[in-house]
Swiss-Prot record:
A single cellular component GO annotation: cytoplasm
Chief place of localization: cytoplasm
Record bears the keyword Protein biosynthesis: yes
Database matches in HAMAP family: EF_G_EF_2_B
Protein name (record): Elongation factor G 1
Amino acid sequence: MARKTPIERYRNIGISAHIDAGKTTTTERILFYTGVNHKIGEVHDGAATMDWMEQEQERGITITSAATTAFWKGMGGNYPEHRFNIIDTPGHVDFTIEVERSMRVLDGACMVYCAVGGVQPQSETVWRQANKYGVPRLAFVNKMDRTGANFFKVYDQLKTRLKANPVPVVVPIGAEDGFQGVVDLLEMKAIIWDEASQGVKFEYKDIPAELQATAEEWREKMVESAAEASEALMEKYLGGEELTRAEIVKALRDRTIACEIQPMLCGTAFKNKGVQRMLDAVIDFLPSPVDIPPVKGVDENDDEKKLERKADDNEKFSALAFKIMTDPFVGQLIFFRVYSGKINSGDTVYNPVKQKKERLGRILQMHANQREEIKEVLAGDIAAAVGLKDATTGDTLCDPTAPIVLERMVFPEPVISQAVEPKTKADQEKMGIALNRLAAEDPSFRVRTDEESGQTIISGMGELHLEILVDRMKREFGVEANIGAPQVAYRETIRKKAEDVEGKFVKQSGGRGQYGHAVITLEPQEPGKGFEFVDAIKGGVIPREYIPAVEKGIVDTLPSGILAGFPVVDVKVTLTFGSYHDVDSNENAFRMAGSMAFKDAMRKASPVLLEPMMAVEVETPEDYTGTVMGDLSSRRGIVQGMDDMVGGGKIIKAEVPLSEMFGYSTSLRSATQGRATYTMEFKHYSEAPKNIAEAVMAAKGTK
């Protein structure tokens, strides 16, 4: 099957933003203008095409990144047909993991900002993730029709808060109720969209006289940014020559793809203005799969051996599975991005991470939650596969004759846990299946059984995250469950060095005995360094074959510390000495000796409890700043600063222990009459004060 669209005309893009910047509405308009959707879905009515899980429609929050394909020939029909694969990403901080994994497979992103709210806390998180993966981006300032809308203020915030380098390619005509359209700085014409056709038709007009000077000033800035792309252009520009439209577009494109600048546009998706011009900017400035460096990977048997794959149909097939979803009709769907080569349904793919071959069943292309079955996918495509049993998020799928492991995604450790139990005994088994399926879809969600109490414990990134998963269990799997009070994921570590601590396991019970003896030194590591084991045995005092057993004994003890049974982190163990018995020594005895030595060393090394600290940002009207700050302080929070918001109001930044944040949304709503909102994300672990540590230990029955 020949390609319908050359790969140079592919754009794999994400639409990402803060919660209420109007991202889903913007995506809806994109689908409408690209001719896929004939009736526009509004988030306000809970009918948006991209928000396809029932809960998203109820809450008006986008949770899962649905992937959709659309086609665009330019708003005036003046471009050859381009193919957009659009990934809608959630803007709520509990779902940051979703944003992160979509960033991994994107080639470019449209960052949507609210013209009133400007750059909000979540925007900074998303921006950092885009930096991490080197994703070229455009900025789209939405909601220009709202009271308090200010395009240039958002421009200033992009520079100061995100350290971005925005280059407006349009400026607004009017704002708030008076927002009519935009001045296109490339054409130096005003674009006015026709409201009767929902913005499908438009006309170019002369720039309003009162905007002429503003338009010329911003065009000059845009041309200067373009000239900085190369010395030849700079000479031409400084020599007073006009740069052509094609030269400006190519120069801005090169600089955008190099992540040096971000073209900036504006509009109001709700009133059908501006999104069309943004789609043209996606074609003009964002990269196709061949404009970015080839994807990198390593040999499956040798991490040092670097490999790469070009975005070309004739290369060997390679793809990354970036999302798993359970679909009510076809079962498990695995979304994957093809980086190189092509594959047909029915072909065999190899998963080097799991070292298994699997047959690719049906391949579906998604349009939000409608689907079309296709026979073949090519380099640059994003599709969903049915019938892969072993693949999980972050796995590579490739040609069995040319294995490659593409860069894995790193997922954060959960910070909050809750016990969950089914309301009826009959649901016990169903609950197990449901939880395992949800955990397969979402790598930041974990399920385990507490050995002591036998309870099922679920862990995730925040209260909302777990609430939504329990909700999904009820809707999708029909399992009603009760959940316990949230539990904080504390950790344990040590503050000083404990030298030469011994563990001796000796058992003499007629016949063959047991004998293991290990001496260790335990010392703290810097935060985040994890566990390290050093073998410093000299002269064979412990035979080689027993040393891994000592390490295993210690590793098996790490998940349950001595203070309150929490995992031990950031410690280094050096095995320095020991002894053995020719007959009685065995691996099990040395495992026990290692475990005993470690527990004893922990007691002697000033063990402490660590608690997760959260970065909390509260957006509040000015009248409530005192109340909010007082409340944060009473929760052991440390206020770190305060910023002004575009449309008035303040952003308060603080660091607060997670244990003090339960139920915060309710108390914040009541303290500010529902006018303040907050976001929170995990920052780091820090030592819990003595009274808190004692209370935790007492609750665990270890005090």
